[in-house]
Structure formats: C-alpha cells, structure tokens
Amino acid sequence: EERFPMMSTFKVLLCGAVLSRVDAGQEQLGRRIHYSQNDLVEYSPVTEKHLTDGMTVRELCSAAITKSDNTAANLLLTTIGGPKELTAFLHNMGDHVTRHDSWEPELNEAIPNDERDTTMPAAMATTLRKLLTGELLTLASRQQLIDWMEADKVAGPLLRSALPAGWFIADKSGAGKRG
C-alpha cells in the first residue's frame, strides 16, 4: 500500500489525542492558552484574531479542524508534547503506520519518497473509525470530534453540495505545496 502525506488531515488525529487527554483528566477543553505574534505561522485565520485574549483548547480544536488554522494546530501539538507524542498516541491505539514528524507549516512539504508526516489509506481509515466510533474516546468526546468535522468550512461546502438531501458528511481535508 502506498504512503500519502497527511497534510492538514492530521488535525483530526491531533484533536482526537487532545480529547483522549481530556477524557483521562489530563487536559481541559476550557483551558485558555495565550500566545504571541511570534507563534503565528502561515495560514492562521482564527488565531491571528485572538492575540490579546488567547483561545481555549476547545476553540483551538475547532479552529484547527473547521478552518484548518495552522497556529491552532501547533499550539495543540505543544499541549500534547509535540509531533513525536502524536505518533506515540497513534501507536498506542494500534496505528503503527501513521507518523507525524513536523510542525506547521513544514509538514506540508510532501517531499517525494519521504515518509515523514505520512500514512496509508487503510491505516487512516482504521484510526478514524477507532476515534469516531470505537471506545477509545468517551461518547461525549467522539460526538465533539464529529461535530467539529461536520462544521468543516474548508472543503465541506464543496463536498456537501454533491450530497443527496438529508445526507451529512464529517470531513477534514488537506492540501500542500505539491497538491
């Protein structure tokens, strides 16, 4: 099976890891995180508006998934211990294929034949199934993750326009410098 760069699709996995920490009592969705202009990276449409007041962990997850905010993702990565800890979280849930190595925006480089920040379709599908329908997260956390994905504002409108009436979609797209 071929490896593919994750690009921003990793943000769902990241917020799943954050929610797992919330469920374990190691994090609080209402905790406010303050950051500075120096923390902002390319494409941060939500976090750039909250330099003075900061954002809660819940707001950062929402920004990361629904608007693909890169600074939000980096701040959340910091809360779990960085890229290596996200990979460790995935390994602990049985995904030994997916690897997350970089911070935003470097992870979007997608250099051919480079396994950094990649996964395989079957591994991603299995991991998403475990996060969204399995017992890894509490029911409340699973529903929160689904709610964020249903509210995706990046690719969601395009995908939703093709759905039959009454159908819904929960998604997280990703694109990089090489497509």
Spell out what each predicted region is.
Residues N74-T133:
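Mid-domain, small-residue-enriched loop/turn segments at the edges of structured enzyme/sensor domains
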